[in-house]
């Protein structure tokens, strides 16, 4: 009987201790849930119609190869699909035809020749969008109302002045208080959207000179999308556990691998780096407030000098 009573006391103590333990743990979990900010759900947006790329702005040999000459415009999704299904091996690696016919930089070709196809650094289907985008080139001019307008990054003021002079856009004097405001017709917006792949930001067909200038600056800026990037310091590869290849004095890794490695070390709620990781890279990245991954990639890499091959 005494032994039974001792067991009851022991069980009673264990139950109280267990209850206290679980209560403390539950409180900690609740506190963590309360202090954390739940990621906001993105508002559902109506899917925008896909822009068609004018045939003359797509690499001519690609157009001929796939019989696209008579298309009124080529969807970028079609270009993506053709690239993925015709220039890659069954295991998703760029094949020899792709190396010859797609637009690759000289550095990219050298890297591909220096590494094995089984290497995670080898160009694969994750790079399809970059390769497909290179098959289209930016327009150097557009036509409207019988006039031809040339697009040059250092002559945008001249372009806007010419549009005004030709009355392709009209100054709206009533709205022009802090900045010159222009009326831009729907027909011109359609031409710009078709030819330059994006529309200017307008409200009720009105646009400020500043926004119009920024628009033409963006559309005339050269696309510098890279498959490989140069690391500023070999230690970065070690910190992020990145595969690399050395070309001369430079150490290269894949842009996508670097981006993914950085993203995986950012807390999804605070948008800050994990403290231990930030301590390792603080020499290269000076702040840890709401990390912009693309900006951090810039901090950790050296700008590439791009020389394209197979371009037309």
Curated annotation (Swiss-Prot):
Intrachain disulfide bonds: none
UniProt GO cellular component terms: virion component
Where, subcellularly, is it found?
Answer: Virion
Q: What does the entry say induces or represses the expression of this protein?
A: Expressed in the late phase of the viral replicative cycle.
Query: Where is it predominantly found?
Result: virion
Tell me the superkingdom of the source: Viruses
Q: Which family does it belong to?
A: Belongs to the orthopoxvirus OPG077 family.
Q: What does this protein do?
A: DNA-binding protein which binds to the hairpin form of the viral telomeric sequence. Required for the production of mature virions (MV).
Protein name, as recorded: Telomere-binding protein OPG077
Organism listed in the record: Vaccinia virus (strain L-IVP)
Q: What is the lineage of its organism?
A: Viruses, Varidnaviria, Bamfordvirae, Nucleocytoviricota, Pokkesviricetes
The gene name reads OPG077
